[in-house]
Every structure is written in C-alpha cells, then in structure tokens.
Amino acid sequence: MKFSDPHLLPAGLERSLRFYVTNPSPCPYLPDRKERKAFTNLAIPEADALHNVLSQSGFRRSQSIAYRPACTRCNACKSVRVATREYDISRNDRRVIARNAHLVRRPVAAQATREQFRLLKSYVVTRHDNGGMSDMTYRDYVAMVGGSPVQSLIFEYRDGPEPDAPLVAAAITDVLRDGLSMVYTFFDPAKTSQSLGHYLILDHIRHAHDLGLPHLYLGYWVKGSPKMDYKRRYKPLEVLDGDRWRPLRDDE
C-alpha cells in the first residue's frame, strides 16, 4: 500500500499493517458498475497516527475501519478536501450563513444519545429511505458513533444557546493533524429553507480555519453522480491524484 507521507507513521508500523479487499458489490454512485474497497483495522495503539496518514492517502473511516475504493476498472471516486485558508466564500454562502446565524454549535463527546438518533432516523427516512441506513437501530447508531478508536467529536447544532434547545443538526467529525474530516452529517429534513447540509460544510470550513487547520476532508467526489457532484462547489477543492494532492480544475 502506497502512502502520501509514510514518514508520519510510527517506526515499524507500515510493515505490520494488513490490508484486505472486499468482494465486488453494486456501486452506490454510478449505475451498472461494481465497487470494491480496500480496508484495514484502525483499532491499534497507534490509531491516530495511522488515521492521519491514511486520510492523507485517500482513506475514509467507518467505526474502527479505514477504507478506500479499490475498483479494478474504475477510478471515478476521487478523494477531495477543501483548502480552508483560501476558501472563496460566495454571496450565496453568506446568505446561507445568515439564515442559520441563530444556530449554536456545540462540540460533545462521540457518544450516542436518543435525541441524536431520533433526528438521524427522521433524516434518513426522508432523504435516504432506500439506503443502507434505513433499518438502523439505536444499537447500530451507538456502534457507529462509539466505535471510533481515533479522535472524534459530534458537533451538535441547536436552535438557541440553551442546553435543551431543539437539536437541528449534527455532524460526526474526526480531528486530524491537518484538518477536520466530516464522517457523517444529518439534520432536520423539514427545515429545507435553511440549506442545512450546505451550512454544515460552510461552518466546518470556518471552524477548521479558526483552529488553524488547513483542510476539511469531504470524502469522495464522483463526477456525474447526483449524490456526490455537489462537492465541487467548495473552492478551492483539492483532489488526490495518485499520491499527491492538487487543485481540482474547473473543466474536470
């Protein structure tokens, strides 16, 4: 396995890593294609160091597993990240931020709550009813949130400063050496006028910048996929090309 910066790995760890590949399954992004993933276990003492290197090399985290696409005849899934220091905020971005100025972001430990789960179920039923999370139970959500062996937080967005103000949105977020990584976000699907999905990304860009972190990792961009193509709006967007990150061109 080739890493973008293997020097960040603890001595000897690269030789002991084991990677596996899943069997082919239907691609969730492009029709008539199959996907495979390479993955490894993050539940080791050096989890944070490994997670940082793997994230820079195009991996994503799901519970205690780090994975990335390993398809044989397709490389449409591109790892992308926003350059937070150079982000070009648009007039529409400012309007979305203004519409959500009343929301209060609060970082909490990566521990599941019933309140979060109710919001998640409402979001999934409305937005992704045919997806793999439609039958998620509270126990599944506990495992999803609490199964992280790396530095993770949940950013809760509440409709006011009171601790018991209504929960409007939440973002499961990993904290990396060079940025924040948005693992999963969900929000009140009834509040369509607030563009909450867009706002959560904008707020993470701003928060990463305030923390002095140069990147916000957004996962995979897939050109032509309605589920993933929206990410190209966040400019400047960097794409992992082989083992190096470069700006995504407007004509791509």
UniProtKB/Swiss-Prot annotation:
Gene Ontology MF annotations: arginyl-tRNA--protein transferase activity; leucyl-tRNA--protein transferase activity
GO cellular component: cytoplasm
Keywords: Acyltransferase, Cytoplasm, Transferase
GO BP, sorted A to Z: ubiquitin-dependent protein catabolic process via the N-end rule pathway
Reaction(s) catalysed (UniProt annotation): N-terminal L-glutamyl-[protein] + L-leucyl-tRNA(Leu) = N-terminal L-leucyl-L-glutamyl-[protein] + tRNA(Leu) + H(+); N-terminal L-aspartyl-[protein] + L-leucyl-tRNA(Leu) = N-terminal L-leucyl-L-aspartyl-[protein] + tRNA(Leu) + H(+)
Enzyme Commission code: 2.3.2.29
Family designation: Belongs to the R-transferase family. Bpt subfamily.
Alphabetical list of PANTHER family matching this protein: ARGININE-TRNA-PROTEIN TRANSFERASE 1, ARGINYL-TRNA--PROTEIN TRANSFERASE 1
Role played: Functions in the N-end rule pathway of protein degradation where it conjugates Leu from its aminoacyl-tRNA to the N-termini of proteins containing an N-terminal aspartate or glutamate.
Cited HAMAP family: Bpt (MF_00689)
Alphabetical list of NCBIfam families matching this protein: PRK01305.1-3, PRK01305.1-4, PRK01305.2-3
Name of the protein in its database record: Aspartate/glutamate leucyltransferase
